[in-house]
């Protein structure tokens, strides 16, 4: 008998803790008839919705002669110091640097079909082989300079390839031809 009293007390304590943390059930929407209704007859559009003036308007990216190429391509061209910093980040993460270039279109375009495919500007020509084992950012920058010298009218980008997961992790434009 004593054991049954103890177990029932333990059960009662446990249920009280559960009940204390429970949320009351939803009882439904209240009728609007109980609240006084006042209508404002101002037909001014500015009085309908307001956010307190906290929004500052941003301009839309101009699409004419301002093509976007890669992530953050709307920023000014990277200097050599900034390129070295990006390449060091790529190497610090253990990614393999690889250079690619495109001589005609440095942006996504569709020439043969309306749906995306192989020839829509996403696949660039690889510059030499991926730089497996590279640990020096200046080596990569020297390859960028060599690619610029060989193809001055081409776009050059640097990608960081993760050879364990076999995915491209970073990609950025290192050089754009004059006028872009």
From Swiss-Prot:
Its main location: plastid. GO terms for biological process: defense response to virus; photorespiration; reductive pentose-phosphate cycle. Keywords: Antiviral defense, Calvin cycle, Carbon dioxide fixation, Cell junction, Chloroplast, Host-virus interaction, Photorespiration, Photosynthesis, Plastid, Transit peptide. Gene3D superfamilies: Ribulose bisphosphate carboxylase, small subunit. Transmembrane segments: none annotated. It is found in: Plastid, Chloroplast; Cell junction, Plasmodesma. GO terms for cellular component: chloroplast; plasmodesma. It comes from the Eukaryota. InterPro entries: RuBisCO_ssu, RuBisCO_ssu_dom, RuBisCO_ssu_N, RuBisCO_ssu_sf. GO terms for molecular function: ribulose-bisphosphate carboxylase activity. CDD domains: RuBisCO_small. Pfam families: RbcS, RuBisCO_small. Signal peptide: none annotated. Residues 1-56 form a transit peptide. RuBisCO catalyzes two reactions: the carboxylation of D-ribulose 1,5-bisphosphate, the primary event in carbon dioxide fixation, as well as the oxidative fragmentation of the pentose substrate. Both reactions occur simultaneously and in competition at the same active site. Although the small subunit is not catalytic it is essential for maximal activity. Involved in antiviral defenses. The basic functional RuBisCO is composed of a large chain homodimer in a 'head-to-tail' conformation. In form I RuBisCO this homodimer is arranged in a barrel-like tetramer with the small subunits forming a tetrameric 'cap' on each end of the 'barrel'. Heterohexadecamer of 8 large and 8 small subunits. Belongs to the RuBisCO small chain family. This is Ribulose bisphosphate carboxylase small subunit, chloroplastic 2. It comes from Solanum lycopersicum (Tomato).
């Amino acid at each position: 008998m004593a054991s049954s009293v103890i177990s029932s007390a333990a059960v009662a304590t446990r249920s009280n803790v559960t009940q204390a943390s429970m949320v009351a059930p939803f009882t439904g929407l209240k009728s609007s008839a109980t609240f006084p209704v006042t209508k404002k007859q101002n037909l001014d559009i500015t009085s309908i919705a307001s956010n307190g003036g906290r929004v500052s308007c941003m301009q839309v990216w101009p699409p004419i002669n301002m093509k976007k190429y890669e992530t953050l391509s709307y920023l000014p061209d990277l200097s050599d110091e900034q390129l070295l910093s990006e390449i060091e980040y790529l190497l610090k993460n253990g990614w393999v640097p690889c250079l690619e270039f495109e001589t005609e279109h440095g942006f996504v375009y569709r020439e043969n079909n309306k749906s995306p495919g192989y020839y829509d500007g996403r696949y660039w020509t690889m510059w030499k082989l991926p730089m497996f084992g590279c640990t020096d950012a200046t080596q990569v920058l020297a390859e960028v300079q060599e690619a610029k010298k060989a193809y001055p009218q081409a776009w050059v980008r640097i990608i960081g390839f993760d050879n364990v997961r076999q995915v491209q992790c970073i990609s950025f434009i290192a050089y754009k031809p004059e006028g872009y």
